[in-house]
UniProtKB/Swiss-Prot annotation:
Gene: VPS26A
GO CC terms of this entry: endosome membrane; Golgi apparatus; intracellular membrane-bounded organelle; membrane; multivesicular body; retromer complex
Keywords: Cytoplasm, Endosome, Golgi apparatus, Membrane, Protein transport, Transport
Top-level lineage group: Eukaryota
Cell compartment(s), UniProt: Cytoplasm; Endosome membrane; Prevacuolar compartment membrane; Golgi apparatus, trans-Golgi network membrane
Main subcellular localisation: cytoplasm
Disulfide-linked positions: none
Single biological process term from Gene Ontology: intracellular protein transport
Provenance organism: Arabidopsis thaliana (Mouse-ear cress)
Identification of the protein by name: Vacuolar protein sorting-associated protein 26A
Length: 302
């Protein structure tokens, strides 16, 4: 029985290391089993290089039909788990068919890699970048090892960033004017604004501002939409009067935000909204939602 169990053990150990891995920023990433691991951070147009070590277990040799390393950018829908859509696929053949008797090291390099999308782990979808090493074998089955890495892309300040100003209300009952200082915010930004009451004929007991994330996956009849409330702020407690102005000041730094993602590879989108909620004394809710754009500022070091 022990012999049979041993037959299914891999013949070798494969490890993947990055050339500058020790000096590069590490980002926490959640695995499928919920475990948090640290992976190195890159951005588009960087060179991905390092070494692959293949070491046969004691007393074993590895017969193979070639060794290759792939750099893959993949999208996985959780309702179609296990099926990956590759939007980036680069391959390096690093060994010809032969045998490995002892530890062998292979250098690899992918120069100036185009990585247009950021790593994303959502409710129904994930986008990941991974190095995949394959020791190709026939009857014995190929041996495969993966190493994830994280991609974040930075952009400069937008040249145009208009404020958001809108008047909303219920006829003859409630009219408010809200204003936010910008329509585009970086991930460490502060949302500034004000809520101005033009007409108040219903008894409002409190007002909140929510930050919401809406993730859309799939297309057409197969579209899945998930909305999360990431943060909620009480702007006012008590009844406002006509002419009253309520300030808005929201720091984005504490929250787990990503940039806005628009129709990534025709697979998914991630949008953010500011949702203004007013509650009257009869617990009726009045709300107005406004989309904002989030981006990762180039000057950020995180």
């Amino acid at each position: 029985m022990n012999y049979l169990l041993g037959a299914f053990k891999p013949a070798c150990n494969i490890s993947i290391t990055f050339t500058d891995g020790k000096n590069r920023k590490q980002v926490p990433t959640k695995k499928d089993n919920g475990q948090i691991v640290m992976n190195p951070l890159f951005q588009s147009q960087e060179t991905i290089a390092g070494k692959i070590n293949i070491e046969p277990y004691q007393g074993k040799k590895v017969e193979h039909n070639g060794v290759k390393v792939e750099l893959l950018g993949q999208i996985e829908m959780y309702f179609d788990r296990g099926n990956f859509y590759d939007f980036t696929s680069l391959v390096r053949e690093i060994d010809v068919p032969g045998e490995i008797y002892e530890r062998k090291t292979y250098p690899f390099e992918f120069s100036s890699v185009e990585m247009p999308y950021e790593t994303y782990n959502g409710v129904n979808v994930r986008l990941r970048y991974v190095l995949k090493v394959t020791v190709t074998r026939g009857y014995a089955g190929s041996i495969v090892e993966y190493q994830d890495f994280v991609v974040r892309n930075y952009v400069p300040l937008p040249p145009i960033n208009n404020s958001i100003k809108m008047e909303v209300g219920i006829e003859d009952c409630l009219h408010i004017e809200f204003e936010y200082n910008k329509s585009k915010y970086h991930l460490k930004d502060v949302i500034l604004g004000k809520i101005y009451f033009l007409l108040v004929r219903i008894k409002i007991k409190n007002m909140d501002l929510e930050i919401r994330r809406r993730e859309s996956t799939g297309a057409g009849a197969n579209t899945h939409v998930e909305t999360e409330t990431l943060a909620k702020f009480e702007l006012m407690d008590g009844a406002p009067v006509r002419g009253e102005s309520i300030p808005v000041r929201v720091f984005l730094t504490p929250y787990d935000l990503t940039p806005t993602h628009k129709n990534i590879n025709n697979k998914f989108s991630v949008k953010y909204y500011l949702n203004l909620v007013l509650v009257d004394e009869e617990d009726r809710r009045y709300f107005k939602q406004q989309e904002i754009t989030l981006y990762r500022l180039k000057e950020e070091t995180s």
